[in-house]
């Protein structure tokens, strides 16, 4: 797309951005100062800083992620909420809705000017709420809470399944006979695979995942491996902004192996990695890699959904959920072996401390410090311990849920297989279904068929008390606005003047910055 007015080249960043710059979703304080001091406190050029850089380059994304990681998370959130302008590259791609949509579904995407436009409820929080016409019947944008946990679980499952495959090949070659092994990871059965002595594979019994055994946790049909690909694709397809110089996707998409700043391994020799989009015809690369780095790191560390009121009714509802067979696919808990995050936030119903929305968050840091002797701030690196992800409710498998869930593709084919959508947050993400066609939880459950027919029928046969308890349980799995939710980092203070507009508490992470007075 074309930039409408003068553009400046940001020194050292290798990217064009407008010198006039930027309004945020709630305003950019550097462009529209206000007495309330509400909005984003840094300009877009300040957020880009010294570009990608390295751990020895102050102001670069790599430096901040490794030495001031909570600032990097907050900066990623501010970029997520930023309302990008046409002067910054936002706007229609050159095709502008014209072309062969059978082969390029992005023609029907966007246009948005902010990540929070599609992932906006509640209050720009990375939640659900946007319909995009990437399919004839549209897609309802899912929420992004716990996105990093999903990426890590899917990647570890992939590693397990491929290790089983490789072991089967080795045994077949050793014994000179075919070897069949079950594909199981984190308690989930992905079928079986048979290896032949010549190294060939029979993958006809692989279930719920591609035959290359790569679990793709993003999008309804399971089509994307990593947060980084997701971010770069959304910037281009939904916002018309090209991160064409992204070094990680450039290398991995051409067969290389890279580790992103968030610790995700992208290996083009094993997986098909989406390349970054081509440069804009007029303006070239429009998104500095530093922007992608901060967005990726923010989403890796983004908070998981909350639990609202838990009582005897929700306890009974959880038992009904298990009894009806829902938990055979919507598996509640899984364990990450190597957690790449630097913090975890547990948010629960607490009307005493959560005086504004009855939720209160407890933050726990998950990093260690290392002085590298450089004179810079110490490195703050992920501990990499195991972590139990509770109440995610998915199996990371694709399933055929029957004709009620099928969707049309532009080329006339039908999409029949969909990932089991995690149920955390489901109480605040209606309407339901990948297409947003089901208005209530009751509707979307009764819509199930195919592999879920038995569970659907068991649900339909529930007596009213069991039904009400089950729905109460599901409705207790909620999303929340972090900037309006009190926490151990920023507790509520009802004595503040003009409470609750002031003093309601938040999970802004500012107190964990190296310099908490330097606001993002």
Regions found by a protein language model. Name each.
Residues 1-11:
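Bacterial N-terminal signal peptides that target proteins for export
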Residues 3, 22-520:
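Periplasmic c-type cytochrome electron-transfer domains
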